[in-house]
């Protein structure tokens, strides 16, 4: 199986998984990059996975379905065009012979879902949409801080080796904020150098890994003393886990 990030718009990635003949894509906000890749690689699109309803994740679905006849899977309780196979957490689906577990991850939107496969060529794979980014997380447009914190806790508990396929190339801006929050984090400092080198060569910083994100991502590290103290310096009223997370997200919004 091959895993490819297809760039779209300014900073989106449409993730494609394919074998020698067939493909699936995740969150195709634009049909054109997918159609070009299918033609170039000689592939048939079988499956479209959607994590949430925002247009930059769904805008290409109708054209791709019309062109290829692909099945479309997406969140059961979000406004999505039919025909759609609607999914909720703890359901499973099979695509390209791979078994995906659906995980409810509300926060960015009210009913956002993620797709986790325990074994793709020997390593787990996560498509997390706009819930988890490298060194960051999605804005809370519909969900609450408590929901997003719980969603991130769920993803952080996945196996260390899980490849994290985020939907946006936000890594450098997220790292700038993360370094402001936790300047003493050597793993964060080291990874910033690596990520800057990748981007200077127009290379993606993704996929990340769950292990790396637990080491560098302040939104997965809100219980670490260094992060807690930094957040409380920003907002002294932040005391419990949820208010600390909420204050951290607000800090990032203003950064």
From Swiss-Prot:
Residues annotated as binding Zn(2+) 1: 52, 54, 108, 130
Pfam family for this entry, one: Lactamase_B
Swiss-Prot/TrEMBL GO biological process terms: methylglyoxal catabolic process to D-lactate via S-lactoyl-glutathione
Pathway info: Secondary metabolite metabolism; methylglyoxal degradation; (R)-lactate from methylglyoxal: step 2/2
Catalytic activity: an S-(2-hydroxyacyl)glutathione + H2O = a 2-hydroxy carboxylate + glutathione + H(+)
CDD domains reported in the protein's UniProt record: hydroxyacylglutathione_hydrolase_MBL-fold (cd07723)
Top-tier EC class: hydrolase
Comment on bound cofactor: Binds 2 Zn(2+) ions per subunit.
Cofactor: Zn(2+)
Keywords associated with the record: Hydrolase, Metal-binding, Zinc
Positions with a binding annotation for Zn(2+) 2: 56-57, 130, 168
EC number: 3.1.2.6
Assembly behavior: Monomer.
Function: Thiolesterase that catalyzes the hydrolysis of S-D-lactoyl-glutathione to form glutathione and D-lactic acid.
Family per record: Belongs to the metallo-beta-lactamase superfamily. Glyoxalase II family.
Entry protein name: Hydroxyacylglutathione hydrolase
Taxonomic lineage: Bacteria, Pseudomonadati, Pseudomonadota, Betaproteobacteria, Burkholderiales
Name of the encoding gene: gloB
